Amino acid sequence: MWKTKFRHMPLIMITISLAVVIVAVMGCAQALQEDEGKDPIIFSDRQWESVWAANEIAQFIIEEGYEHPTETETVSSEAFQIGMEKGDVDVDMELWRMNLPEWYDEATEEGFLIDVGPIYERSVQAWYVPRYVVEGDEERGIEPMAPDLETVEDLKDYADLFEDPDDPDRGRFINGISGWEVTEVNSVKMEIYGLDEHYNIVEPGSASALDSAIASAFEAGEPLFFYYWEPTWLLGKYDVVRIEEPEYDPDVRKQLDLIVEGELSVDEVDEACAFIETDIRTGVHSSLQDRAPGVFEFLEEMEIGTDPINQVLAYMQDEEADPEEAAMWYFENFEEDWRSWLPTDVEENVEDALSEAGVELSG
């Protein structure tokens, strides 16, 4: 078939046709090489819902708007620190620096970590019990179980209320997940407060296991003593009472961190404190400034906000949406916000990609 066509074509037309094919192939190969030549930007995933959503939003913009590949690496707090120092991790969308104060100070001073600004303007992490434990819930027919419970000291009197089903003689504290720095801090605080003598400390193996343990207790109207944080869908959905601790003190917190790092014995410390309330920031490896300056500038501009991310997380929970679907919902419902982060050409690329994905935009 092809022989017949070429046999009746003038030589000059054959030459031109072949030249066009060669140029097209070379162009595709060059484009492929250019794309392959870009090292992917590595995002850390420390396994909680808000960072999954934030990663999806940022990675979509980077891949579609800046045409730069990205990847996600699941890491523990320790692995994240090592990876950022070595340059194996490029972006940490939720740098909870208050949980890593010593490392954060060293990393920013040495210069391999750049704090590019807040992703959420406020955050809270603390120890909680359901409000119905303290006040009851008339609609659900729940009587107050611990009407005098207010402080960490009071918890010593209520260990039997928060009974560990696997060890009925002791109470149970639901800690953060294994591998988080804050989980170790919580364990140290439990010991300093003297609560380790009354409670077993349970560390769920994943964020989903943590959420399931808490949500199932709330739905059943059962007593529960647990650690959690905001922004999250869970604290947006369930009514809680925060357990009072001594006010945050940077010197006291430094001692807690030294214990976690093995540089100080818990026996040498007799006080602990609440977590600091602050914003959550994005951390970027310094090499990204040269490798992808446009992406670096975008990350400096990107701020989702606490209320918007809470709405995204509520959407994920209510609609059983995955992080990618939640990101599309964010793009559709907070269009003015994300457009403000981007230069015009990148904004147009993102708009085209969202249109192809079926996202309806007003702009």
PLM features: residue spans?
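A conserved helix-loop-strand patch within extracytoplasmic ligand-binding domains
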Residues: 113-174
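An extracytoplasmic/periplasmic, membrane-proximal ligand-sensing/linker region
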Residues: 50, 183-197, 208-211, 215-221, ...
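A bilobed periplasmic-binding-protein/Venus flytrap-type ligand-binding module shared by bacterial periplasmic
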Residues: 125-142, 278-291, 312-315
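Flexible, solvent-exposed loop/hinge segments that line or gate ligand/substrate-binding clefts
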Residues: 101, 115-117, 192-194, 200-311
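Pocket-flanking alpha-helical
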Residues: 55, 75-112, 213-216, 233-238
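Short helix-initiation/N-cap motifs at beta->coil->alpha
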Residues: 48-49, 69-85, 201-213
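Short, low-complexity disordered leader/linker segments with a strong preference
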Residues: 1-40, 358-363
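Short, well-ordered beta-strand elements
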Residues: 35-50, 68-73, 170-174, 299
